[in-house]
Regions:
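Non-catalytic terminal/interface segments that mediate subunit docking, oligomerization
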Residues: 184, 195-354
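Glycine-rich phosphate/ribose-binding loops and adjacent secondary-structure elements
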Residues: 1, 7, 18-49, 55-60, ...
C-alpha cells in the first residue's frame, strides 16, 4: 500500500482501523474515510501493537480493542521511547517532559525531518479530508432501504412442514432451537455440556454442520465480551466486486451494504431484483440451483458440484457480480446439496480461478436453523446467509400459535434474523474477532 502511493499513516489506517462503526461522536469525515476503505479492504483487528517506519517517519498503532500495551516517554533532549512496559530504560524522571500510553485504535507518529510528534487527530483529520469520501459513499454505496419493497410471500403450513421433512427438521429442533429465537430474538439458554454422541460415531443421520466444532481463544488471543464490549464489534459488511486496491475512486465503494450477515427473504428478493431493468450492471445476480439427482448417489453429487463450479465461473465471466447458491425447489428426484459442502466448494473454486473478489456469495438454504450453522457458512466463504426455512418456520409457528405466542409472524422472522446475527457475534467474540469481515 505504501509503495503503491499512499502515505505510511494512510496505509496503517487502512490495515488497522479504529473501531468506527458504533462510535457516535466520531468526526463524520473520519467516519466516511473508514467506511469507504472498509469496502475495499477488510480490517485486521489484532490484538497487536504494530510499529512501522519508512526511514523518515516512525510510529506505532494499537489495535481497535486496545489489547496490547504501549507506553511512551519523551525527554527534554529529544529522546522518545515507546515500549510495552514502563521502566525498560533507566531514565531520569526529571528529564521526562511527556509520557502517556497508546489508546485503542490510536496512532503515535514521529517525523524525523520535522523533528516533532504528529498527533493522532492531526494525522487522521488530514487524511480524511484528502478526498470527498462522504460524497463517494453517497453516490456509490447501495443500502437496503434505498431499494424498492416487494410483496412478501407467505407460505402455507403444509408447505413449511413438507420442506422441514426434506431438510430433516425434528420436533425437538423446532421447539428448542427455532421457537425460542423466533419468540425472543435470542438463542435459547441451556446448560453447559451435551450428551449427544459426536457426529462421527452417531448411528443416526447427522447434518454436515455437526462434524465441526467451535473453538475459543486462549492465552495470546483473548476473547471479547460481546455484550459489554459491543462498541468495538461490527457485523456490517459489503458485497459486490472489489476494485483495484491501489487506485481508489468513487467506483471503489460501488457495493451493497449489509448491516447483518443474515438476510431475510424480502431482502434477498430485493437483491435479486436490483438489476432487473439492467440499470445496475454492477449488481447482476446469478442464481445457482444446489440440487442433485438422488438416484445417482455420491457420483451424481460430485458431478453436480463440479458442474455448479463451472457454471459460476461462466456467470462471473459474463458479468455476474452476486452469486446466489439456492437449494429451493427440491422434490422426490432432486435433493438439496448440503449448503456447507456447496459453499466451501464454490468459494475455493473461485479462489483458485482468481474470481473470488469479483463476486459476492449468498447462500439461500433450508438446512440452517441455528447459530453454529450460520457461523460455519460465513467461515467457509459466504458473504451473507438467507436461512429461508428457519424464517418461514418462525413465521408459521407465530401464525399457528404453536410454541410462539403473542408475536406477529413478521416480528418472528425478524427475531430469527437478529438472533442468528447476534449469535454469530458471540461466536466471533469467543475467538477474539471483532468484525465479521475479519472472521471470514
Amino acid at each position: 500500500l505504501h509503495l503503491g502511493g499512499r502515505t505510511l499513516p494512510h496505509a496503517v489506517m487502512m490495515m488497522i482501523p479504529e473501531s468506527w462503526e458504533n462510535d457516535t461522536v466520531m468526526d463524520p469525515a473520519r467516519r466516511a474515510f473508514y467506511e469507504f476503505h472498509s469496502s475495499i479492504m477488510e480490517a485486521w483487528d489484532g490484538p497487536a501493537c504494530v510499529t512501522f517506519t519508512d526511514g523518515t517517519q516512525i510510529g506505532a498503532v494499537l489495535d481497535r480493542n486496545g489489547l496490547r500495551p504501549g507506553r511512551f516517554w519523551v525527554t527534554d533532549d529529544g529522546l522518545v521511547v515507546l515500549a510495552s512496559e514502563a521502566g525498560v530504560l533507566d531514565l531520569d524522571q526529571a528529564s521526562i517532559v511527556r509520557k502517556g500510553r497508546l489508546e485503542p485504535g490510536r496512532m503515535f507518529l514521529l517525523d524525523l525531518e520535522e523533528h516533532r510528534i504528529i498527533e493522532d487527530d492531526e494525522i487522521k483529520g488530514q487524511l480524511a479530508s484528502e478526498h470527498p469520501y462522504d460524497e463517494w459513499l453517497y453516490s456509490g454505496l447501495v443500502r437496503f432501504e434505498d431499494l424498492p419493497d416487494l410483496e412478501h410471500i407467505v407460505h402455507t403450513h403444509a408447505s413449511v412442514t413438507r420442506r422441514q421433512q426434506v431438510f430433516g427438521y425434528t420436533e425437538e429442533e423446532v421447539r428448542k432451537l427455532v421457537a425460542p429465537i423466533a419468540r425472543t430474538g435470542a438463542e435459547a439458554i441451556g446448560s453447559m455440556g451435551t450428551d449427544t454422541p459426536i457426529a462421527a460415531i452417531s448411528d443416526r443421520p447427522r447434518q454436515l454442520f455437526d462434524y465441526f466444532s467451535q473453538l475459543f481463544a486462549q492465552v495470546t488471543n483473548p476473547p471479547l465480551d460481546s455484550i459489554r464490549e459491543e462498541i468495538v464489534t461490527s457485523l456490517a459488511g459489503t458485497m459486490g466486486p472489489e476494485k483495484n486496491l491501489l487506485d481508489p475512486s468513487p467506483a471503489s465503494c460501488r457495493m451493497l451494504q449489509l448491516p447483518f450477515p443474515v438476510i431475510d427473504n424480502d431482502e434477498l428478493a430485493k437483491i435479486r431484483h436490483m438489476n432487473k431493468d439492467g440499470d445496475m450492471p454492477g449488481f447482476s445476480v446469478h442464481v445457482v440451483r444446489g440440487l442433485y439427482d438422488v438416484a445417482g448417489g455420491g457420483r451424481a453429487l460430485k458431478e453436480k458440484i463440479d458442474a455448479i463450479c463451472a457454471d459460476v465461473s461462466r456467470a462471473v465471466a459474463d458479468g455476474a457480480r452476486i452469486i446466489v447458491l439456492s437449494d429451493r425447489h427440491s422434490n422426490a428426484d432432486l435433493a438439496p446439496i448440503p449448503s456447507l459442502l456447496l459453499t466451501g466448494a464454490v468459494h475455493h473454486h473461485m479462489v483458485r480461478e482468481k474470481l473470488r473478489t469479483q463476486a459476492g456469495l449468498i447462500v439461500e438454504t433450508g438446512d440452517v436453523r441455528e447459530v453454529h450453522h450460520v457461523a460455519l457458512l460465513i467461515g467457509f466463504g459466504a458473504t451473507a446467509v438467507n436461512p429461508y426455512l428457519a424464517l418461514e418456520t418462525g413465521e408459521d409457528l407465530a401464525r399457528e400459535g404453536v410454541f410462539v405466542q403473542g408475536v406477529e409472524p413478521a416480528k418472528a422472522a425478524r427475531n430469527v434474523v437478529y438472533g442468528l446475527g447476534k449469535g454469530v457475534l458471540k461466536v466471533m467474540s469467543k475467538m477474539g474477532v471483532s468484525t465479521v469481515s475479519s472472521y471470514t
